[in-house]
From Swiss-Prot:
Gene Ontology annotations for the cellular component aspect, listed alphabetically: cytoplasm
Organism: Ehrlichia chaffeensis (strain ATCC CRL-10679 / Arkansas)
Main location: cytoplasm
Keywords from the named record: Cytoplasm, Endonuclease, Hydrolase, Magnesium, Metal-binding, Nuclease
UniProt family annotation: Belongs to the RNase H family.
Organism ancestry: Bacteria, Pseudomonadati, Pseudomonadota, Alphaproteobacteria, Rickettsiales
Listed EC numbers: 3.1.26.4
Protein name: Ribonuclease H
Amino acid sequence: MKDELNKVVIYTDGACSGNPGPGGWAAVLLFDDNEKTICGNDSDTTNNRMELTAVIEALKLLKVAYNVDLYTDSVYVKDGITLWIRKWKVNGWKTANKMPVKNLELWLELDSLANFHKVTWYWVRAHVGDLYNQKADMLARSQIVR
């Protein structure tokens, strides 16, 4: 039962210089009394791709199903996975404007991972003093290779 799963809190962020351009992503995972950070980069990407990658890489670290509280400052990620994705599936992965969904391969991977875990999604305002959001932001920006 998914209610009996172990719990993890995750904060993610992505950053990009140029958009498109070099980018970085990061996640802070909080397990009970333990904290783990992960981060990475891409030489030619977009901010949205980095935001998605941060969430995907964090969820991929979890080898068994977890109850996940996931905090992102990306409306694109939160609304995409909680609202838009259902409509995209019904519309053959087309947007409301009948255009192909951007970053489709990332959305497909995120959808699969999110369905494996029990994820509760939260949007957090960026740059207002949330400790772990700031940590993820700092790590993501540190990964940008100019």
